[in-house]
From Swiss-Prot:
Alphabetized InterPro entries for the sequence: BBP-like, KH_1_KHDC4/BBP-like, KH_dom, KH_dom_type_1_sf, STAR_dimer
Positions of the KH domain: 171-238
Annotated Gly residues bias: 7-28
Composition-biased stretches (Polar residues): 31-53, 136-146
Name of the protein described by the UniProt record: KH domain-containing protein At5g56140
Record keywords, A-Z: Nucleus, Phosphoprotein, RNA-binding
Cysteines paired by S-S bonds: none
Region (Disordered), start-end ranges: 1-53, 136-158, 289-315
Organism whose genome encodes this protein: Arabidopsis thaliana (Mouse-ear cress)
Gene Ontology molecular-function annotations: RNA binding
Length: 315
């Protein structure tokens, strides 16, 4: 259902944000480079002395740099009409860094080269700080445009200047799969999976309805309060876009396609996407053990993390 106004509760009512497939061009998946480098302008680690740093250290540093880029983009957004080239260059740098981050979580695992539904241009976007009960170290920000293909960001003169604000609803099939943790799969480690959906589509993604707050007791307390009317509805997703009228519908449909993929349950033994999420969590926590590493402990992060599901989010 397409609407011309934003839906969902106000305030800190709880949508997590995220990012995914890049827009424009050909297929939905892209080939990765396995390199992970620190951008020249990224802050350097205080204990960096020219030697090689651990992968987790570089990963955290990249995330910090990306968070700063996202904050700058948020401040620059009102000036898009007068600074289109600066805006485009900033988005290209965001794309470059986020692609490196996605590459690190996907290809550095020995023998794993299975693109996830979010693999094409996999982008880390900023999430709302609370993530409805999910831990997040990123500030609350708006979405990030997708890859620098032939779209409105690269063609400032191609837009009519008309901005449309629209929202679609995607139902989550909890009745068909009552034991499947859809919210955990959508959010991913520290909300990164959902950040990528937002980042690649330039849409805002909100998880709403019963079960969208991590703490059931808190959900009951918030039910019926202003801004939390959605808690009386079945679990669902709202996808909001405020974009040039020429691309808004395409971006919404792109986001819906990604979410439909993520909402399709799979057998755990064949779920490469979940394995990527588990490995990413281990990398973020500094507990990753690469195959052949002299360090003690489990070789596979999937066997040692005990992360089954990321449950629901808090308002």
């Amino acid at each position: 259902m397409m609407m011309m106004s934003s839906l969902g509760g106000g305030g800190g009512g709880g949508g997590g944000s995220g990012g995914g497939i890049g827009g424009g061009g050909g297929g939905r998946f892209m080939t990765y480079s396995s390199s992970l480098s620190v951008p020249p302008s990224a802050p350097q680690s205080p204990n960096y002395s020219g030697g090689l740093r651990s992968q987790s250290s570089v990963f955290v540093e990249q995330e910090k740099y990306l968070s700063e880029l996202l904050a700058e983009r948020h401040k620059l957004t009102p000036f898009l009409p007068v600074l289109p080239h600066a805006f485009r260059l900033l988005n290209q740098e965001i794309l470059r860094v986020t692609t490196l981050l996605e590459n690190a979580t996907v290809l550095s695992q020995s023998g794993l080269d299975h693109p996830s539904p979010l693999a094409s241009g996999g982008i880390f976007q900023n999430a709302r700080a609370d993530m409805n009960g999910w831990a997040s170290q990123f500030p609350s920000e708006r979405s990030v445009p997708s890859s620098p293909g032939p779209n409105w960001l690269n063609s400032p003169g191609s837009s009519s200047g008309l901005i449309a604000k629209r929202t679609i609803r995607v139902d989550i099939p909890v009745d068909n799969y009552p034991n499947f943790n859809f919210v955990g799969r959508l959010l991913g480690p520290r909300g990164n999976s959902l950040k990528r959906v937002e980042a690649s589509t330039d849409c805002r993604v909100l998880i709403r309805g019963r079960g969208s707050i991590k703490d059931p007791i808190k959900e009951e307390m918030m039910r019926g309060k202003p801004g939390y009317e959605h808690l009386n509805e079945p679990l669902h997703i709202l996808v909001e876009a405020e974009l040039p009228i020429e691309i808004v519908d395409a971006r919404l449909m792109q986001a819906r396609e990604i979410l439909d993929d993520l909402l399709t349950p799979m057998e755990e033994t064949h779920d490469m996407y979940k394995k990527q999420q588990l490995r990413e969590l281990a990398l973020l926590n500094g507990t990753l053990r690469e195959e052949g590493s002299p360090m003690s402990g489990s070789v596979s992060p999937y066997n040692s993390l005990g992360m089954k599901r990321a449950k629901t989010r808090e308002g």
